[in-house]
Amino acid sequence: MKVRIKFRKQGNMKFIGHLDIMRYFQKVMRRADVDIRYSEGFSPHQIMSFAAPLGVGLTSNGEYMDIEVLSTDDSKTMVRRMNETMVEGMEVVSYRQLDDSSKNAMSIVAAADYTLTFRPGKEPEDLDGFFQKLEAFYHQDQILITKPTKKGERQVDLKPLIYQMYRTEDAVFMQVSTGSSNNIKPELVMEAFYHSLGEEYPPFAMQIQREEVYADLGDENERKLMPLEALGEDIE
């Protein structure tokens, strides 16, 4: 049986990198007595994959991992059992069964939501003016940046890859393309914005939090974003 787990990563856990998070969940599976499937061969390992690794320093309300299990209790029980083993800052939100034919989360990630909030004392003096400039920046026809490549440099237009960007209270909400083909980090967008103002991007001025990760069930003519969690069903 394929299972998709959604979890939060908060507090000091934001400083723990992806590989250590993976090792952490391997221990969680054992401590919570999850009947996880192991690979075959000389060096068996738990069948486990993550949707989109989160950068160090970012918090999240919407991280995903897929596992395979041989047997399971209901979703509520499994969430409770795993959370009983969790350290502060980590919390399992949901545990949902997938169809046997479902692709793993990593292969279908298409977009992600982020909230960017100024740290105390790091806010611009003119906060309203900052957001007005950000809105004007987003509504440009093109947002060109220069990216280094193996053959030199090339220009990339970020605009088609930023699906939404707007002010929410005193924070920036951003929905961007995510995945193996067109992966845009919110830091890159903000760096381009500050560069357009002739200023240096202050990388530690904002706390960035991922809110959700999506698959795209649409076609080449229209996006139809669906939270990865919605592709599974609770086990009763």
Locate each region found by the language model.
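Ordered, soluble secondary-structure elements with a strong preference for glycine-centered loop motifs
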Residues: F15-L19, T72-T77, P124-D128, S180-I184
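Short beta-strand-to-loop capping motifs
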Residues: F7-K9, I67-D73, L116-K122, M174-T178
